[in-house]
């Protein structure tokens, strides 16, 4: 059997890591050949028009489908570069050959104008509640931070694609990395879904859960320093509490908001309560993180499958997470999450719970659903790569 795996980019972020992992684990399956299609397969065209409808990408994909003749097509991301132009190409090939097609839902572009499920009332990034997806009033939610005209054009394009291309209908099964994504699709009437947890990096060496007795905790933030990541809001809460339960926050990463935060919280930096460590490679990062008591994940957008929760568990650390969107439910079975709401009382309660958690020497974290082996077995079953896996698929689908 031959599988064609498709993604916008070869290397960029988390979705690309999952793309490459899916290729590797499928190639390791007996009797399976794998071909790939991404940015390297055609001449890149710059500009917004190409992103809206990338005709060169569609023509290149049609040629690859004819040449490779796959029985399965697995798509990761397409709307950032390949564009919706490739969806009719896949649909036509399916109708002609009986091939089965699958989409891994790395973001929310099938259900809302903003793929991060964000709105911008008064310019402030705010997550859209899932129940709003079923209401017509979502049309009036500002989905872009770039102004009313850009927002209107974005919505017009989204509705045109939804009506004319119907991307959700082109795939036999939508693979959801989190229960929250599955629920979001269900709110828009999309039920052909199955859970497929993204795999965590195999480069990590598992460590025993860390214990700490101190009253004031040493926290670490990992990721892009951008508004939707919520670092500013978390630091505001911590500063308002005079860092009563927090000894320090170390920020690993970079981004467009870093300079602003360095100015805004200069007093915290001078006092040694806030430190910007910049970007580190994975090997150095996970060694450095082990020196902290816990990670903080303060995102103000819904997220989808924040693997930092799993990675923290693997190196023995708990995570203080903003109780919002997918963060509220993703990884609950692992046992290393402490939730907080965006107010001082909730943060204080969560920090007290975190201190108690860190003092429990017998605690254990379970990340078995996020291993490469589990991902490989589940993906093979969902793609029905053998008769046995096809028989086993029904009880596994959600």
Segments predicted by a language model, with ranges:
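Carbohydrate-associated surface elements
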Residues: 180, 199
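Nucleotide-activated donor-binding/catalytic signature segment of Leloir-type glycosyltransferases, i.e.
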Residues: 262-280
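Short hydrophobic beta-strand element within catalytic cores of glycosyltransferases
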Residues: 309, 318-321
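Membrane-proximal helix-turn-helix segments that form the acceptor-binding/catalytic region
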Residues: 109, 121-173, 183
